[in-house]
């Protein structure tokens, strides 16, 4: 259910874009992201920082898109969010409080050097996605960008998640692997 809620604003953005335009879709994205926060809180009595940051960025860039009637703002939102995620991961690693280990370290027991590699892998991934987003957003058609944002970046993130889980599992001690089975 929680994963479905995570994708709901993206699905709404895509559907509204297909039936209307980027501006109505941007407004729908703001509303859908706000509703996502409300529903998440009602169901789980908690809102993750990532959702708050995403809502802030969607609201800020979406509002600029609507006020100035310029789709460049909503296109930049994707890159800014990825850059913030990369920065947060890099800072957490630098401060010796890795976010990924904090999120998954209880279930996936691996050495700190493995968490460090995974963290830098995701930093690189987020930065690369942000750069590719800039290229697609400003060199290809708006429709291509929307499809890339919805399907391309989502697929890349899912593939990256699978690669990360396989890598972490490979480096887990055997006794912990047995507990997961």
Curated annotation (Swiss-Prot):
Membrane topology classification: Multi-pass membrane protein
GO cellular component, as recorded: plasma membrane
Record-linked InterPro entries: YciB (IPR006008)
Family: Belongs to the YciB family.
Superkingdom in the source lineage: Bacteria
Any Pfam family matching the protein: IspA
Record bears the keyword Transmembrane: yes
Role this protein plays: Plays a role in cell envelope biogenesis, maintenance of cell envelope integrity and membrane homeostasis.
Compartment annotation: Cell inner membrane
Protein source organism: Shewanella loihica (strain ATCC BAA-1088 / PV-4)
Name this polypeptide is given: Inner membrane-spanning protein YciB
Designated gene of the protein: yciB
